[in-house]
Amino acid sequence: MNKILTFLSVLLMVFSSQAQVKGDQKKVVEVSSLTEFRTYLNQDNVHVKLKAGNYQVDDAKKIRFFEITGNNSYFDLKGARFMVDSKLFSRPDLIKSTDGNSMYCAIEISGNHVMLEGLYIETYGDTPGLQSKNKIFNIVGEHVTLKDVELRTAGSSPWGYGYLYGLGGGDVRKMNGIRVGYPAKNVKLLGCKVHMRAMGHAIFLQGSENTLIEGCEVDGLLRTTDAMLKETSGYGFDKNFYAAKGNYIEGTNVAEDGKILPGEIISLSEDGIRMYPDYNGHPTTNTTVKNCTVTQMRRGICTGLSTSGDKVIDCVVRDCVATGYNVGNADTLINCSADAKYGEAFCIAYTDAKNAKVEMNILDSRNGIANNLLAKINGTGHHVVIKTEAPEFIPEAMAIKLSVWEGYGNFDENAKMHATDITLNNQTNTEVITFNGTENVDIKSKGKVRKATDSENEVNDSNRTKR
């Protein structure tokens, strides 16, 4: 009898749990138009499947063209393609937001526990926005996941000159990819692709917490200044090929008076994956970037501006102009790779950065232009390992330099340049040069290690004011 009662109790529990699972499952709502799709964006607990196909986005009511404000929802957009007319970003009649941020974007997700999967979205046209803060995605909710989303940006101005005419304001109108910003927490970007065909960042964070960026790919375009100087019309031609400022501009050298020089190279976009320090006083913290690739951007992966200590794991950066990895305070790079064709493979640029850990594999850096700096190390207490699979990948003219103004970073000309308490294991044949301000370093190197000459130190110090 007891066995029968036990069996019946177990059977009842099984049926109850199955009923509970069925009750928790959301009914899939299938829609086939953007009008229908919009009706579910402010609803909670929905599972929406948009029919595969091409969708034209050429009208909107607000500066956030699609606003996903509902919670606990899943949007299945696999096979759907949104073609967004860049003219929408210049519409002054669209309703402004109430969050104090005037930026235009195609899709904003402010709801919590939302997943959006599978969308291809592209901006097209050459109409620049009203302001420089345009972007495709703006994520400000908690526990939001973008999965297998693909973006292609267009519609920035002036196009074809990268950062030579400024980073925002003035004539510059950007079209960024994905922003994750305060009050976003626990956001995941999984398997996303961003094709940058506009000035702007591909993926960037401002005041977010606990962000995971995994399996994502970013690519941009490069252009030589030689090609630019051959123009017979256009924005640069009208400016007589003078940039917005002189000397060093984000990885590209111009003349002291701003004249664009031959033999240089620029990225037509900005950074691949970038952390800003904060958003309105809310710090960007605890970011992990894993198994990502960045190609042909200004900086590849830029954690250096966030001081909380971020993790970059198993990432690959190729053909970036300012630096492959911008490393900062307490950052950890594990099994990462980069080349130094057009800019240093990585830099720990800031004098106030402490205790970074870097494992860097140098990729084929031959056949580049305008760069002989393999890596630069400033700051205090870093542990760095540099290696390569083939010695011939690194040209003999390249060097690893400590305590230098050269290359990206060091914008405070009053800073005391130094590299202190550094542990460097250089497993390449590349020469290591220590400049004035290098103290208490532990260097193991296959390549020659030497102190900079007096003339080299003079040149280094002269770069202090050429940022």
Regions found by a protein language model. Give the residues of each.
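Hydrophobic h-region of N-terminal signal peptides that target proteins for export
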Residues: 10-18
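Acidic Gly/Asp/Thr-rich repetitive segments characteristic of extracellular carbohydrate-active
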Residues: 21-49
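Surface-exposed or flexible loop/turn and strand-edge residues in extracellular/cell-surface modules
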Residues: 26, 45, 52, 63, ...
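Extracellular beta-strand-rich solenoid/capping regions of secreted or surface-exposed proteins
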Residues: 38-43, 56-74, 83-117, 123-145, ...
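Short glycine/acidic-rich loop motifs that flank beta-strands on beta-rich extracellular proteins
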Residues: 59-64, 84-90, 125-134, 155-163, ...
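Right-handed parallel beta-helix
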Residues: 103-108, 126, 134-138, 169-184, ...
